[in-house]
């Protein structure tokens, strides 16, 4: 079954079976916003991937339903609640939202502390990445994707930037080495090491602590921020395929090879589209080695730049999908309202937003 047919069948089932059932159970008819939330939750089905839940608990104090809490966090991203306290207040005051998330009664809504503990458990288990990988493989695993656009976006953190530890540099002797003198070879570059590493190994070696980032925006002005960088691969339709969180100071090119390998393990695609920050020989070679065609804007490096061929320039214009995805994540799905600390929790917060964005964009693309 093709992607559009599969999504249309699912939405038709929801319209014919689920919505009438919800209207019978709820005191107030569902609003359009609530119906949209139901569609997104049914498309993601985050509750299937929750590691610890009451139905599978055998020992210890009974835990609150983690499935309902996970659905509530997705609702938080969709409905643009900045704080967990705002989400909890809305769950207590709105029966429809409470029922959609999975809380039968008002007293079933857990405390803020329970929400916080559950969020920490989800972050530690990498729930967001697991659900996102499953979504991409289920809906796009059999599709041939034309272009994958790769870019990063600044994520402002809520913590102090960590201090960089300066490495002790050993002074080298100047001039030619003496006869019989053996000098240590230079350390291999990170990009060269990444070519022989798996994606998981390369990502683990990238720094992810909160620090200070600097970049030049589209208008040529320099911007600085404290926090992180989220590196995302996006297809032509604006669907995020892979995401990696690093420190703000990490250069974009240092994450490209792990992202290529991650995305290549999920979907088949033809072209890698990247801006001038990714213009490195190792990236061109890695893209070709994986069976893709790299189209990377050339970095002048004080030299005269040869312009792209017309057909390459036309394909490169598809890279705006990445910018639209970054913008939607920040404006519509909580990318600007990071209220947690630590890379694991920040990634979990952003992944809830990316899950909601993936489902919302999938509904738009298929016209459902």
Residues covered by each model-derived region:
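Charged, often Cys/His-bearing segments associated with DNA-binding zinc-finger transcription factors
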Residues: 1-51, 364-368
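Structural motif
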Residues: 58-67, 222-223, 340-350
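Short, positively charged, Gly/Tyr-enriched micro-motifs
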Residues: 62-130
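Polybasic low-complexity intrinsically disordered regions
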Residues: 112, 116-289
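Helix-centered, glycine/charged polyanion-binding patches within enzymatic domains
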Residues: 276-340
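Charge-patterned, long linear interaction tracts outside catalytic cores
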Residues: 341-368
């Amino acid at each position: 079954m093709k992607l559009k047919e599969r999504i249309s069948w699912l939405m038709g089932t929801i319209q014919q079976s689920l919505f009438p059932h919800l209207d019978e159970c709820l005191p107030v008819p569902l609003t359009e916003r609530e119906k949209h939330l139901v569609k997104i939750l049914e498309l993601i089905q985050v509750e299937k991937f929750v590691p610890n839940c009451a139905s599978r608990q055998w020992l210890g104090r009974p835990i609150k339903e983690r499935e309902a809490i996970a659905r509530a966090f997705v609702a938080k991203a969709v409905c643009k609640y900045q704080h967990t306290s705002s989400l909890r207040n809305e769950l207590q005051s709105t029966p429809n939202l409470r029922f959609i998330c999975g809380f039968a009664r008002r007293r079933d809504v857990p405390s803020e502390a329970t929400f916080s503990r559950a969020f920490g458990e989800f972050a530690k288990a990498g729930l967001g990445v697991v659900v996102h990988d499953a979504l991409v493989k289920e809906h796009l695993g059999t599709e041939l994707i034309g272009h994958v656009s790769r870019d990063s976006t600044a994520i402002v953190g809520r913590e102090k930037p960590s201090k960089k530890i300066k490495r002790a540099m050993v002074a080298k002797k100047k001039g030619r080495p003496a006869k019989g003198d053996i000098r240590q070879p230079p350390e291999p570059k990170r990009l060269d090491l990444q070519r022989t590493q798996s994606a998981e190994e390369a990502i683990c070696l990238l720094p992810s602590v909160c620090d200070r980032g600097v970049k030049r925006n589209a208008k040529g002005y320099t911007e600085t921020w404290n926090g992180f960088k989220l590196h995302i691969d996006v297809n032509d339709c604006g669907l995020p395929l892979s995401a990696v969180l690093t420190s703000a100071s990490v250069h974009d090119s240092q994450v490209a090879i792990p992202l290529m390998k991650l995305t290549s393990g999920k979907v088949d695609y033809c072209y890698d589209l990247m801006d001038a920050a990714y213009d490195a020989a190792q990236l061109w070679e890695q893209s070709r080695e994986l069976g893709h065609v790299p189209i990377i804007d050339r970095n002048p490096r004080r030299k005269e730049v040869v312009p792209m061929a017309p057909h390459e320039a036309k394909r490169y214009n598809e890279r705006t999908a990445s910018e639209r995805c970054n913008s939607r994540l920040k404006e519509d799905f909580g990318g600007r309202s990071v209220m947690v600390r630590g890379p694991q929790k920040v990634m979990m917060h952003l992944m809830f937003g990316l899950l909601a964005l993936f489902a919302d964009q999938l509904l738009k693309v298929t016209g459902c």
